[in-house]
A protein has these predicted regions:
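ABC family nucleotide-binding domain
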Residues: 4-235
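C-terminal boundary and immediately downstream tail of ABC-type ATPase nucleotide-binding domains
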Residues: 236-256
Length: 256
């Protein structure tokens, strides 16, 4: 049986007295596409931030590609070793946020090239070739020398995706990547993600409010409700056929 690329084992997360995640158990297979849906405040972004190693669990284990993220720190109190370990894991994970976080003073080609060259110390020419190919792939081959402020929101989001992909991640995380876009720009961004989902064998985790999109691309959908996974299954099982009343209420609010 294939080992999961991501495993959450009884993960809890509290901020002060507030328990945001209350025992998350989750396996994601290496090429699996997972959509996370749920009401505002249910803990979706916290799961993504934990995967990105930006938040440490209050208890439980998070294992990414066989590496137990915080174990070293807990067991050996070796903070430096743990930081190295986390850096390695981060190298395998690409993330696209709601806001694009591009570097405004760099062209879009430079935006894509900077991390592989400066963080991974890769060969500049090789990175340039890969970056050009990725920008072509997201439909921006004619904008290599443009600056972020010369692009639309949808184009900026596509640069953000290309920039993450140039790092050749094993896992891509998408946190509500269309929610800051004007409605007419949503389609072009979803189209790029759809293309990646259908043709790339990396794992993908998407927090999304686009139910039809989740139905189309997700192998698995998780319904997060008040810090627990209240329902999970295939997209059709969760979005079309679940009898969970809170999930049905949540979906009705989307469908109007
Ligand atoms: N650093 C923090 N300090 C305190 N509370 C936090 C922190 N981060 C998140 N929270 C709280 O945890 C809860 C879950 O937040 P999270 O962003 O994970 O929810 P979400 O499901 O992604 O919501 P939304 O759909 O609105 O983005 C919220 O009530 C939020 O206010």
């Amino acid at each position: 049986m294939t080992e999961p690329i991501v495993r959450f084992q009884d993960v809890h997360k509290s901020f002060g007295d507030f328990d945001v995640l209350k025992g998350i158990n989750l396996d994601i297979k290496p090429a699996e596409k997972v959509a996370v849906i749920g009401p505002s405040g249910s803990g979706k972004t916290t799961i993504i931030r934990m995967l990105m190693t930006l938040e440490e669990p209050s208890s439980g284990d998070i294992i990414v590609d066989g590496k137990n993220l915080w174990k070293m720190k807990k067991k050996e109190k070796m903070v430096k070793a743990n930081e190295k370990h986390l850096r390695e894991v981060r190298g395998d994970i690409g993330m696209v946020f709601q806001h694009f976080n591009l570097f405004p003073h760099m062209t879009i080609l430079e935006n894509c090239m900077t991390a592989p060259i400066h963080v991974k110390k890769e060969n500049k020419e090789e990175v340039r070739d890969r970056s050009v190919k990725m920008l072509e792939r997201v439909g921006l081959g004619d904008k290599l020398d443009s600056y972020p402020n010369q692009l639309s929101g949808g184009q900026k989001q596509r640069v953000a995706m290309a920039r993450a992909l140039v790092m050749r991640p094993k896992i891509m995380l998408f946190d509500e990547v269309t929610s800051a876009l004007d409605p007419e720009l949503v389609g072009e961004v979803l189209e790029v993600i759809r293309d990646l989902a259908k043709h790339e064998d990396m794992a993908m985790v998407l927090v999304t409010h686009e139910m039809d999109f989740a139905l189309d691309i997700a192998d698995k959908v998780l319904f997060l409700d008040e810090g627990v996974i209240a329902e999970q299954g295939t997209a059709s099982e969760v979005i079309e056929h679940s009898e969970n009343e809170r999930l049905q209420g949540f979906l009705r609010r989307f469908r109007g």
